[in-house]
């Protein structure tokens, strides 16, 4: 069995007039993330980690931000397509460990819903998805609530 590890990172700016999609769910917040798609930083970080582990470049390569078909797309669709892409090389997901950095909104109560939604999209157990939330203690762009970032590490194995 061949086991590979991948790492992903994403960041988007918080702006007024956008919905806040994070971890595949819609959160109530006065600002949302700016991007070509729905700008779900957690899903994007997971996609990049999966693609990296399979040595298949990155999310921007497969789903370019200048392509009209991805304008305002639900990032869960991109995640499903990413899982299908890595499957073409014989890989399946072992587990995911992710961290979201945001001052607000507080995410603790939303993590189980994120795990469930993402597990359904990827066809894995929610128990195989660890999501943690942290702040930057009011430091940097995240601390000033100018943006949200996410990091993801994945383990994939060849079936």
From Swiss-Prot:
Site (Transition state stabilizer): 36, 135
CDD domains, sorted: MECDP_synthase
Broad EC category: lyase
Keywords for the protein's UniProt record, in alphabetical order: Isoprene biosynthesis, Lyase, Metal-binding
Cofactor: a divalent metal cation
Pathway terms, separated by semicolons: Isoprenoid biosynthesis; isopentenyl diphosphate biosynthesis via DXP pathway; isopentenyl diphosphate from 1-deoxy-D-xylulose 5-phosphate: step 4/6
GO molecular function, one term: metal ion binding
Record SUPFAM superfamilies: IpsF-like (SSF69765)
EC number: 4.6.1.12
Keyword Transferase among UniProt keywords: no
Cofactor: binding comment: Binds 1 divalent metal cation per subunit.
Residues involved in 4-CDP-2-C-methyl-D-erythritol 2-phosphate binding: 10-12, 36-37, 58-60, 134-137, 141, 144
NCBIfam families: ispF (TIGR00151)
PANTHER family for this protein: 2-C-METHYL-D-ERYTHRITOL 2,4-CYCLODIPHOSPHATE SYNTHASE, CHLOROPLASTIC
Similarity field: Belongs to the IspF family.
Identification of the protein by name: 2-C-methyl-D-erythritol 2,4-cyclodiphosphate synthase
Gene, per the UniProt record: ispF
């Amino acid at each position: 069995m061949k086991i590979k590890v991948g790492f992903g990172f994403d960041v988007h700016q918080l702006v007024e007039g956008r919905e806040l999609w994070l971890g595949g769910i819609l959160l109530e917040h006065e600002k949302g993330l700016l991007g070509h798609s729905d700008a779900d930083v957690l899903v994007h970080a997971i996609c990049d980690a999966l693609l990296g582990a399979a040595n298949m470049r990155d999310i921007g390569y497969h789903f370019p931000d200048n392509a009209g078909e991805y304008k305002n797309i639900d990032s869960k669709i991109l995640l499903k397509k990413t899982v299908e892409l890595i499957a073409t090389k014989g890989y399946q997901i072992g587990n995911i460990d992710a961290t979201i950095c945001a001052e607000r909104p507080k995410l603790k109560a939303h993590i189980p819903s994120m795990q469930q939604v993402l597990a359904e999209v990827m066809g894995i157990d929610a128990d195989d998805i660890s999501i943690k939330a942290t702040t930057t203690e009011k430091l940097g762009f995240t601390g000033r609530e100018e943006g949200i970032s996410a990091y993801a590490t994945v383990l994939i194995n060849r079936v």
